[in-house]
């Protein structure tokens, strides 16, 4: 093994003889067969002597970390090899930037429908995932582990590749912190949802939309969204639902949320609807058995305990991650890979969003907010005279401008959402506007 790896890393931990001696001190004999020096950690492939149990080596992770003066050491078997991987942090870690990943040729491949810039592997190779094949994603990690940055990089990856006509987002952010910066971008199908009760209703609308899409695809004789879009000029957009803090929703409407998510995760893939859920509390009451069963693809950033690691991944190891974007990615094939997620600053995110807002206005689907508000108390309509005057004004406005949407009436007439939605419904009954089509738009008849 080349000693120049140790010189490059300026770290005796990359010296194979040094690590072999530490293991021998604990009664584990074997040889370091290969060293892979990555941007954040160095992978030592250790071949144990005959008769040495893997569990014995894995249990030495804390002792190896102490003897190498490292923050942590992660030990795991390497699939398809007779070696055990010992991952030790580098003295200085390289930054991984989003621009490096999206400029990679793999990102532009046509067969990747919804590309996600996952980051770099231990060896420094850019890794790109496809949300359509996942088809849903569960993310967990403590505060400061890089979870929120990961959500941002996923959103930006998709926005970078697909136009608002090709992909729409529904963003649910009970914390009112991370996703509010995307308010007003043209890719949004409705405003960012910050109320937990309203979020449950919005997920109910997504289930309804999924069923509507299935009926449409059955009528056309196609099996999925790609088959439908290949037949039509007006494409059916993908819908990506992003939930930033799952635990807040589970506290308010746990069973209802779980039922909706179960339906969507089992059936929504063919309809082009995908869910990305994140939580900083990966306990069994948040990540229930039902949710785990339907989210085979998961990402775990640094967690506080082995129990949390087992809850999200089914095995320990996430508690030994280094934070700041260091993660374990579990694919649907149950293979776990360590990846270093790319970083994107708040300033960059805001610049991108400002640019997107300058390009076009969001075209909200009125039915979503109507669906979300239907359980809430409506406005007082006791003053019939005012109601009639307002309705006549709205009809004149719609006929003059040729636009019919709830958000348009809200802006022009300066009225609340409930009233605007009811006026649109009345216009539909009176034959002034058409029913909403599959993308939520209405025509003035």
Language-model features: locations:
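N-terminal "pre-motor" subdomain/linker immediately upstream of P-loop NTPase catalytic cores
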Residues: 1-138, 150, 273, 282-285, ...
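Short, hydrophobic beta-strand segments
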Residues: 1-6, 39-50, 245-248, 376-381, ...
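Residues within the DNA-recognition helix of helix-turn-helix
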Residues: 60, 154, 423
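P-loop NTPase catalytic phosphate-binding loop
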Residues: 78-87, 106-223, 231-303, 307-322, ...
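Conserved alpha/beta core segments of nucleic-acid transaction machinery
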Residues: 331-445
């Amino acid at each position: 093994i080349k000693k120049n790896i140790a010189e490059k890393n300026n770290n005796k931990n990359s010296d194979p003889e040094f690590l072999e001696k530490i293991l021998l001190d604990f009664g584990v004999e074997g040889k370091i067969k290969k060293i892979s020096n990555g941007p954040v950690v160095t992978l030592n492939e250790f071949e144990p002597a005959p008769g040495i149990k893997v569990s014995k080596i894995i249990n030495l992770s804390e002792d190896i970390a102490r003897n190498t003066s490292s923050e942590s050491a992660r030990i795991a078997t390497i699939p398809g090899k007779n070696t055990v991987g010992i991952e030790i942090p580098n003295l200085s870690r390289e930054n991984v930037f989003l621009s490096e990943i999206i400029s990679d040729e793999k990102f532009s491949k046509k067969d990747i429908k919804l590309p996600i810039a996952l980051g770099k592997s231990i060896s420094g190779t850019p890794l790109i995932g496809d949300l359509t094949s996942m088809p849903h994603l569960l993310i967990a990690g403590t505060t400061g582990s890089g979870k929120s940055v990961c959500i941002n990089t996923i959103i930006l990856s998709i926005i970078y590749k697909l136009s608002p006509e090709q992909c729409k987002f529904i963003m649910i952010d009970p914390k009112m912190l991370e996703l509010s910066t995307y308010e007003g971008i043209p890719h949004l199908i409705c405003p960012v949802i910050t109320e937990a009760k309203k979020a449950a209703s919005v997920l109910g609308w997504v289930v309804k939309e999924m069923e509507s899409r299935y009926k449409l695809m059955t009528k056309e004789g196609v099996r999925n969204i790609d088959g439908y879009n290949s037949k039509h000029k007006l494409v059916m957009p993908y819908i990506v639902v992003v939930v930033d803090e799952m635990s807040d929703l589970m506290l308010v409407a746990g069973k209802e949320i779980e039922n909706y998510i179960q339906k969507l995760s089992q059936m929504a893939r063919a309809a082009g609807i995908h869910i990305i859920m994140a939580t900083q509390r990966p306990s069994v009451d948040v990540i229930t058995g039902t949710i785990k069963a339907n989210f085979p693809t998961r990402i775990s950033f640094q967690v506080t305990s082995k129990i949390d690691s087992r809850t999200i991944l089914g095995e320990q190891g996430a508690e030994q991650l280094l934070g700041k974007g260091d993660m374990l990615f579990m694919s649907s094939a149950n293979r776990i890979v360590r990846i270093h997620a790319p970083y994107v600053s708040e300033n960059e995110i805001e610049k991108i969003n400002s640019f997107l807002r300058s390009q076009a206005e969001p075209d909200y689907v009125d039915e979503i907010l109507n669906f979300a508000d239907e359980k809430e108390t409506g406005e007082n309509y006791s003053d019939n005279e005012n109601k009639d005057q307002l309705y006549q004004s709205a009809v004149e406005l719609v006929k003059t401008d040729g636009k019919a949407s709830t958000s348009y009436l809200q802006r022009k007439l300066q009225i609340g959402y409930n009233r605007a939605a009811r006026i649109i419904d009345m216009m539909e009954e009176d034959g002034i506007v058409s029913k909403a089509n599959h993308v939520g738009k209405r025509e003035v008849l």
